[in-house]
Amino acid sequence: MSVTIAIGSDHAGFDQKKILVSFLEEKGYTVHDFGTYSTDSVDYPDIAHQVADSIQKKEYDLGVLLCGSGNGVAITANRHPGVRAALCWNEAIARLAKKHTNANILCFPARFVSVDDMQQMISAFLGEVFEHGRHEKRIGKIE
């Protein structure tokens, strides 16, 4: 079964998001783009809520969100029960997001991280497995 990915960004991450959609589709993933669809200014919560809702409902396996700092989309997504959105800025953090927190949304700071680094972080994340054990107990305390 193919991994399905929900992706979205505000205007600050629009250009990078387009590249990420192509990157993921070329790797064989099924991707749904929740917008935005231009560089016109939008409010990041409008996009982040859609992606997080789709993850919460288990319509997609992984979410990817971008905004200027990554903080806004991460905070918004984490308001949804069952969503574990991780702000990632390097490959090690992305790996740990999967291994230790079983994150289901990756959030990127579009103004501070290159699209090449985002691609590496997504690949690293998808190549990891959740370690369970003590981490599962900790996640239970969040839920």
Where are these regions (language model features)?
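C-terminal binding/interaction regions
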Residues: A6-G8, A12, E91-E143
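A general structural signal for well-ordered alpha-helical segments in protein cores
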Residues: K17, Y44, A48, G70-A74, ...
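Short, structured active-site "lid" loops
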Residues: I47-L65, S69
